[in-house]
């Protein structure tokens, strides 16, 4: 069970602090120089590999001291993600925090074994996983969503200085309880024809796959109706590659 973050009582509270960790930025990826993915090494080991020791330090020195964690991620492997918060189902505390953050989508997903999110969940520390944009790419909308969401959370916890304005979300988040990837049926050059965040209907043409010589042109049709919240931006795809993530079940 996730514990509820403590609200601070006024600006006189000494421990009104938030911590920003950019420990992975120097490597530009979550794979540590020893070749291991840090996000698959939690809770870590004091005497293990470098990645395992980094995970152990986070879990033993920092995480036990905090009331709430917001973990910011971008899409990998040329995938562009719509701004979204990922949490587990049936956790009212996380639902309230995700709604306060105000990202366009809230995706219910299971915790992955040995991930940072799973390790925090096991010890009751609330964590919001933010996904948005893609690696090595700047997107103003995604950045603003992430910043504004953090400000709303700080305001909710009564930790934000009154000189900072807090904007309301333009609309309520769409809660996604189940989703599926549409996969490429052929290899070739892929170009999408739909925008992220849009609602598509089963049978809609959402892109096409061609060859370099113009002799082959396959129109990709939506296999499900739902919101598009992740798109593969890679110019070349192979048969079976995930090209578009679509919601198939929504929560009221």
Predicted regions, residues:
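Structured catalytic-domain cores with a bias toward divalent-metal coordination
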Residues: 1-252
């Amino acid at each position: 069970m996730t514990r509820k973050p403590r609200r601070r009582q006024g600006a006189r509270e000494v421990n009104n602090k938030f911590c920003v960790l950019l420990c992975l930025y120097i490597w530009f990826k979550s794979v540590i120089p020893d070749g291991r993915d840090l996000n698959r090494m939690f809770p870590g080991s004091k005497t293990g590999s470098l990645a395992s020791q980094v995970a152990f330090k986070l879990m033993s020195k920092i995480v036990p001291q905090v009331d709430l964690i917001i973990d910011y991620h971008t899409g990998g492997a040329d995938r562009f993600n719509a701004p979204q918060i990922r949490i587990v189902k049936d956790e009212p505390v996380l639902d309230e925090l995700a709604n306060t953050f105000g990202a366009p989508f809230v995706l219910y997903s299971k915790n992955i074994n040995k991930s940072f999110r799973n390790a925090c969940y096991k010890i009751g520390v609330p964590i919001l996983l933010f996904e948005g944009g893609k690696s090595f790419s700047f997107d103003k909308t995604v950045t603003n969503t992430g910043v504004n969401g953090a400000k709303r959370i700080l305001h909710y916890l009564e930790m934000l200085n009154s000189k900072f304005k807090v904007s309301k979300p333009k609309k309520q988040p769409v809660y996604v309880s189940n989703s599926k990837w549409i996969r490429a049926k052929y290899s070739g050059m892929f170009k999408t024809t739909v925008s992220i965040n849009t609602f598509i209907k089963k049978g809609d043409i959402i892109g096409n796959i061609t060859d370099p010589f113009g002799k082959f042109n396959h129109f990709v049709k939506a296999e499900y109706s739902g919101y598009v919240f992740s798109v593969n931006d890679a110019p070349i795809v192979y048969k079976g590659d995930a090209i578009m993530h679509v919601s198939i079940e929504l929560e009221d």
